[in-house]
């Protein structure tokens, strides 16, 4: 019911049903009704997984509880693998270098129980390729396409695999075919838009030989797919932010600004991953399109300080460094620019370097309490 209410747009009722499931779990501890518990945990987990991105970690926990009771359940094993696959970008910080993430192990386990699940095969292929296990990944892709070639979920992951490996034409072909079978998939529309965006960027990078006509062509195709994605799923904030940047490229700054303000207003609580991505893109809007360095710094800094090691964090750090270094090239005594470099170094874990930057910043602005406070904290950490 939670799932149905969510898709009917009745979010309050959807949340209410989720809470009722949790209440059932409290009333039915592990020692009672053993045959019911795994099903209840499983239903709760699938509901969380289908609600929104901000519930994925709860889905992981519910699937884990279901599997503690019924370890060989095919659906719970598959669901746990999918949930891990979707949440891993938030939880990989503690992995050793070259250590495989939990999703790879769980996808293998799920496929042992259901070896012909083409969706799981295609998901595992995407994940293995990210860890340079190309031979096994390609073998799984072939199996998935042979087992269930018309499944749009298979097509979208195969398309993602090709896009990640810069095989854009193959990815576009796969996603366009998937879209014919699943016209209302906001995810596939978004994936297709990302491919078109790569095409646009590739054409732009051919300067001075790039064709503005080609750039406009790919931009318009990208905009069309993103507009479809957000029409189908109005809560698709990341697609909205990508769309806003494209509107800005077309110099529709007012519409872009409206979209970013709406994204920030409607951001789900505790969704740090999405928040980081929105602030990075909003920073790009101010930096590249509005030429508003001060506002760009505000949003890049917000993205930087969110404690997730994602691509967007690296972009925020890189842009802040670029801004600070440019200012220092004009004025070596710019205390704010030095403090900005200190903030970036600190966020990246380079405490000694951060302390040095803040110390230099204080030499330029001796009464700045913010720099002094940061320097004191860093020195305490270092000793």
Segments (PLM) and residue ranges:
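TPR alpha-solenoid repeat register
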Residues: 76, 120, 154, 188, ...
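Flexible helix-coil transition and linker loops at the boundaries of alpha-helical arrays
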Residues: 24-37, 76, 108-114, 227-231, ...
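"A position-specific structural signal for the A-helix of alpha-solenoid helical repeats
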Residues: 1, 7, 36-39, 43, ...
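Conserved structural position within tetratricopeptide repeats
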Residues: 23, 65-68, 109-112, 143-146, ...
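Structural motif corresponding to the intra-repeat A-B loop/turn of tetratricopeptide repeats
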Residues: 8, 51-53, 87, 131, ...
């Amino acid at each position: 019911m939670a799932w149905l209410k969510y898709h009917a747009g009745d979010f309050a009722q959807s949340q209410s049903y989720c809470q009722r499931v949790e209440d059932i779990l409290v009333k039915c501890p592990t020692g009672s009704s053993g045959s019911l518990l795994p099903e209840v945990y499983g239903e709760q987990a699938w509901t969380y997984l289908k609600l929104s991105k901000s519930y994925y970690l709860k889905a992981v926990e519910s699937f884990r509880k279901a599997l503690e009771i019924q370890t060989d359940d095919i659906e719970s094993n598959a669901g746990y693998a999918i949930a891990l696959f979707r949440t891993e970008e938030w939880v990989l910080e503690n992995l050793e270098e070259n250590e495989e993430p939990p999703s790879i192990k769980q996808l293998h386990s799920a496929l042992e129980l259901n070896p012909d699940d083409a969706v799981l095969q295609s998901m595992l292929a995407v994940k293995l390729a990210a860890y340079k296990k190309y031979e096994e990944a390609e073998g799984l892709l072939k199996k998935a396409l042979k087992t269930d070639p018309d499944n749009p979920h298979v097509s979208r992951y195969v398309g993602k695999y090709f896009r990640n490996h810069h095989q854009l034409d193959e990815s576009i072909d796969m996603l366009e075919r998937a879209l014919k079978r699943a016209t209302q998939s906001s995810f596939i529309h978004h994936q297709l838009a990302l491919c078109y965006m790569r095409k646009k960027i590739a054409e732009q990078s051919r300067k001075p030989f790039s064709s503005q006509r080609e750039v406009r062509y790919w931009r318009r195709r990208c905009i069309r797919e993103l507009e479809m994605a957000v029409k189908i799923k109005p809560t698709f904030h990341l697609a909205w932010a990508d769309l806003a940047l494209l509107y800005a490229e077309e110099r529709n700054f007012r519409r872009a600004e409206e979209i970013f303000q709406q994204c920030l207003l409607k951001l789900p609580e505790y969704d740090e991953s999405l928040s980081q991505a929105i602030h990075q893109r909003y920073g790009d809007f101010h930096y590249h399109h509005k030429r508003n360095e001060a506002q760009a710094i505000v949003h890049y800094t917000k993205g930087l300080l969110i404690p997730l090691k994602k691509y967007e964090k690296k972009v925020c750090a890189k842009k802040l460094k670029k801004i600070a270094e440019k200012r220092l090239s004009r004025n070596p005594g710019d205390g704010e620019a030095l403090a900005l470099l200190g903030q970036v170094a600190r966020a990246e874990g380079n405490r000694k370097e951060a302390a040095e930057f803040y110390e230099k910043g204080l030499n330029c602005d001796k009464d700045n309490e913010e720099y002094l406070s940061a320097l004191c904290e860093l020195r305490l950490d270092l000793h």
